[in-house]
Amino acid sequence: MSLSRRQFIQAAGLALGAGSLPLRAQASSTQQPQLPVPPLLESRRGQPLFLTLQRAHWAFSGNKKAAVWGINGMYLGPTVRVFNGDDVKLIYSNRLTEPVSMTISGLQVPGTLMGGEARMIRPGEDWSPVLPVRQPAANCWYHANTPNRMAPHVYNGLAGMWLVEDAVSKAMPLPSHYGVDDFPLIIQDKRLDNFGVPEYNPPAKGGFVGDTLLVNGAQSPFVEVSRGWVRLRLLNASNARRYTLQLSDGRPLYVVASDQGFLPAPVAVQQLSLAPGERREVVIDMSQGNEVSITAGESAGIMDRLRGLFEPSSILISTLVLTLKPTGLLPLVTDNLPMRLLADQIIEGSVIRSREFQLGDNLPGINGAIWDMNRVDVQAQQGTWERWIIHADMPQAFHIQGVSFLVKSVNGAAAMAEDRGWKDTVWVDGTVELWVYFNQVSSPQFPFLFYSQTLEMADRGSAGQLVTVAAPTL
């Protein structure tokens, strides 16, 4: 909708008379905040990890604090780091006023430990699963997956990163000093009112998109880094928005890992797609000592920002994700980026069957069926491969619990090099072909879910239930 003459005069008067536009119409502040780095919570033998879901206060803009949800007293949650071979006792405590269920996307555990409808945590109650970590290094994330309420619960702040490390990742010559040269970046979009308070009005179709870009809860932050390689663990925790990331001076991003672990070798890219729910690891060469910014597309012009005073906008006010500012001298010895990240090529098995799935909003649900907790949509066998062909009439991300998959083709073409590792989340704009490997078992009482990662669509029923039966014993 274009601005009427009267609306334009009103907006111009606001801008000139007050000396500045309200928060929603302002461009990003010239005074950048420092990147908030979530505290690190590590597993220790015999000691539980506590994640308390509670109300908190957080300043998204300046010093104006807004009421939010979060974990352990802050917006979003701590970064949890565990190790392959650990048995992690996790204690979720719900100190909110409504039921919540939590899950860890990317963690390979049985359906009994995945969360969801069968593991609702009532207000004032706890859930204390013991999680056997038996998988290679991966960047996972924990978040609310409350049935029919996942979108507002994640938007409110119930999310955080969950890192799995193993012997390979510990020996890898990649930056590994958390908060020094190894940073988690949780990217979201929000809509803030003139007081810096998040607004959430889900649309009748599609998913919610905001006009304000946040990283770890901050707008356009900066971080000081040492000269040399810097490692960024990227998570798109937005409800629906996909990002195309690039560096401001044209230098490459080196992609080293996707959702479920390392790529076979680093991949240099000028632009990198990050879909909702997707995780990627990149490293950046800061050895020359030049400041650089990560950006995500084109920002709104002044007319778009003025229009945002009168109607919700889906155009980002600023597309600045993060500015990296190198400090200090270049170390005498710096590691080169390894030529190989995995000792062996990814081994593919034989596909035993094919399935097709239609994701839509015109025809709600998946294959025209709305999620039903009493219905099993897919039954598979642990240790087998299947070919899944996913179609979408509206671009969206798609996630499967309890599996790892390889992207074989996208709209008939081979997958991009940065998408040729193990994944659990994929962007679907047309048709994608996946080869799905079933790692873990589930049951009708504790099924895995597959769903649209456009969270409002998942809440409206674009989800299905997967039961993976144990492999037969010989």
From Swiss-Prot:
Its Gene Ontology cellular component terms are:
cell division site; outer membrane-bounded periplasmic space
Q: Where is the signal peptide?
A: 1-27
Which Pfam family is one of this chain's hits? Cu-oxidase_2
Keyword Lipoprotein part of the UniProt annotation: no
Keywords, A to Z?
Cell cycle, Cell division, Periplasm, Signal
Q: Where is the Plastocyanin-like domain?
A: 229-288
Q: Does the keyword Cell division apply?
A: yes
The cellular location(s) given in this protein's UniProt record come to:
Periplasm
Q: Name one GO molecular function term.
A: copper ion binding
Gene Ontology terms describing biological process: FtsZ-dependent cytokinesis
Q: How is it modified after translation?
A: Predicted to be exported by the Tat system. The position of the signal peptide cleavage has not been experimentally proven.
Q: Which InterPro entries match?
A: Cu-oxidase-like_N, Cu-oxidase_C, Cu-oxidase_fam, Cupredoxin, FtsP, TAT_signal
What family does this chain come from, according to its entry? Belongs to the FtsP family.
Its biological purpose: Cell division protein that is required for growth during stress conditions. May be involved in protecting or stabilizing the divisomal assembly under conditions of stress.
- NCBIfam families, per the entry: PRK10883.1 (NF008135)
Entry protein name: Cell division protein FtsP
Native organism is Yersinia pestis
Q: Which gene encodes it?
A: ftsP
